[in-house]
Amino acid sequence: MELHATTIFAVQHDGKAAMAGDGQVTLGESVVMKHTAKKVRRLFHDKVIAGFAGSVADAFTLFEKFEAKLNEYNGNLERASVELAQQWRSDSVLRKLEAMLIVMDKDTLLLVSGTGEVIEPDDGILAIGSGGNYALAAGRALKRHNGGQMEAKDIARHALEIASEICVFTNDHITVEEL
């Protein structure tokens, strides 16, 4: 059985960028192994935020690879993401990794997947993991209808809270990072 980590949400709003992740790690389909995992991290001199969903061991491998690419390309988020995606897709060992990453800096928000995809959303919102669709819907509604009264970090936190009320693989122990 593998350990899985679940929901990550990221938003760009009013010149700020925020990412939130829940703390639940699940063994298989029925056992919660940890409630306080930190799946959102600051990288490259605190200028980049990255979050993962999927197999925990695979995600740590990808974090290391991504951080190495960030350092190699002097913090250029887009270049580091494309290079990681190319390596991930072409390397026979990396190709077996079961995780996804959301990475962001103040200006750019990207989804990086093992199929070689690097996707920048049109609306400045991304979510991944088992509760991703719930968080995405909640975040879009919050940004669209309350965006004038909320900061990016608040949208991120509330989107994850709503997802945790619906998805059994997402809890309400939420980590939020903001740029």
Swiss-Prot record:
GO terms for molecular function: metal ion binding; threonine-type endopeptidase activity. Na(+) binds at S164, C167, T170. Keywords: Allosteric enzyme, Cytoplasm, Hydrolase, Metal-binding, Protease, Sodium, Threonine protease. Its EC number is 3.4.25.2. InterPro entries: ATP-dep_Prtase_HsIV_su (IPR022281), Ntn_hydrolases_N (IPR029055), Proteasome_sua/b (IPR001353), Proteasome_suB-type (IPR023333). One of its GO terms (cellular component) is cytoplasm. It is an enzyme of class 3 (hydrolase). The active site is at T6. PANTHER family: ATP-DEPENDENT PROTEASE SUBUNIT HSLV (PTHR32194:SF0), METALLOPROTEASE TLDD (PTHR32194). Belongs to the peptidase T1B family. HslV subfamily. This is ATP-dependent protease subunit HslV. It comes from Listeria monocytogenes serovar 1/2a (strain ATCC BAA-679 / EGD-e). The gene is hslV.
